[in-house]
């Protein structure tokens, strides 16, 4: 039965690498390398598609995801190479048994339930010597098996980070895609929708009528109304058309053909660059979450309630901003000419900082994704009915809340933010950078031609002054782009300022 040299049979424990067939080692390495190359080519191909379609923001978001995956890869390498040294560290027993994830005898039969990997993970990786034994009264800081489980957790983080990022972007784009019908309608009926000779009473407009009612007179009932409105129908047609009109009137030239829905879509892509990143502050949150996930403390159950509460609070605030603009229109005017004009200003947002809302959304999406990842990792490593899931009904509720928050934040809150944040005092320059250069080049080209032609006057300089209603920089690229005249003969080639894909 005994094998020669370092060999062993199935009853003698696992074989080392020197006794493993070469074909087995070559096959395993080849499969792993092939899978890695395919994944790298897929990411590279996605980047090429974004570049060809001029999706600069999505390409930058993809690069950020690759950077986050690289960080997770470094963490994995450090765990692999340093696991024997880490496992050799010892601490006093009174510290080694304090603040554990599970109780000492917490299991279905009154005994501690070992994870399914314990029986086959007693092995050495990248080192020949076993971890040093601790002296009496001391225990290892962390075992080799526990380090392997942390390694698996890092892998789960990487996979679910990519999945959640893709889901977030797909849901957000799907929501904004539904506004395309409204945009096409207002472009086709541009003259009728913006007829300056049409006078109406303020309370007769759809926008004011849908937001101003007896409930709006009391601030408590006002916010209750906004709370439920975000879940029933977050953006109405009148909301979209009114905010579109306010944005164009303040930031662009009147009567200009402008695809506002496409601008919102690019603005969402620009916001996506922020929400896919993992900042040091978020890594600190991960450490705190793991630190306080102590048996019997139930701190994580309280932390789980943070994403849904913040999501509902942000949605209520964004709806309140829309309703406040409707109230301001009613207070300012009894009769309006054309479409109602909202007052564009940063003061509508918390601390006059629209970007603060985006950072909160970033935290919500990350924490929610982390908790879902944590659930699936525990299920994989310890089973669905492990000591981690002592109150199973509570765990099911937490998972259901996580799925609901993911949908609510990605499909409703994030697109609503992308729309309402355009009512701030500034507009995003990153969306207009390429268009600005093209517009200026065309203007200079036309100016040069007309100056060289006898009897032709030079075209007027672009109006760099913004229209009243917002405090924006007078010479911002958006204003320069908006004020450049587009010749009628050029309109067939460039329908609007955002004519790209």
UniProtKB/Swiss-Prot annotation:
Q: Does the keyword Transmembrane helix apply?
A: yes
Which domain of life, per UniProt?
Answer: Eukaryota
Membrane topology of this protein: Multi-pass membrane protein
Q: Name one Pfam family in it.
A: Mlo
Topology check: give the Extracellular ranges: 1-22, 90-151, 295, 381-391
Q: Which residues cross the membrane?
A: 23-43, 69-89, 152-172, 274-294, 296-316, 360-380, 392-412
Cytoplasmic topological intervals: 44-68, 173-273, 317-359, 413-501
Calmodulin-binding: region residues: 450-471
Q: Which InterPro entries match?
A: Mlo (IPR004326)
Q: What is its main location?
A: membrane
Q: Which GO terms describe its cellular component?
A: plasma membrane
Q: Where in the cell is it found?
A: Membrane
Molecular function GO labels: calmodulin binding
GO biological process terms on file: defense response; pollen tube guidance; protein localization to plasma membrane
Q: Which UniProt keywords apply?
A: Calmodulin-binding, Membrane, Pathogenesis-related protein, Plant defense, Transmembrane, Transmembrane helix
In residue numbers, the region (Disordered) covers 443-501
Compositionally biased residues, Polar residues: 491-501
UniProt cross-references to PANTHER family, sorted A to Z: MLO-LIKE PROTEIN 1 (PTHR31942), MLO-LIKE PROTEIN 5-RELATED (PTHR31942:SF53)
Family, according to the entry, reads as follows: Belongs to the MLO family.
Function summary: May be involved in modulation of pathogen defense and leaf cell death. Activity seems to be regulated by Ca(2+)-dependent calmodulin binding and seems not to require heterotrimeric G proteins.
Q: What is known of its domains?
A: The C-terminus contains a calmodulin-binding domain, which binds calmodulin in a calcium-dependent fashion.
The protein depicted here goes by the name MLO-like protein 5
Name its species. Answer: Arabidopsis thaliana
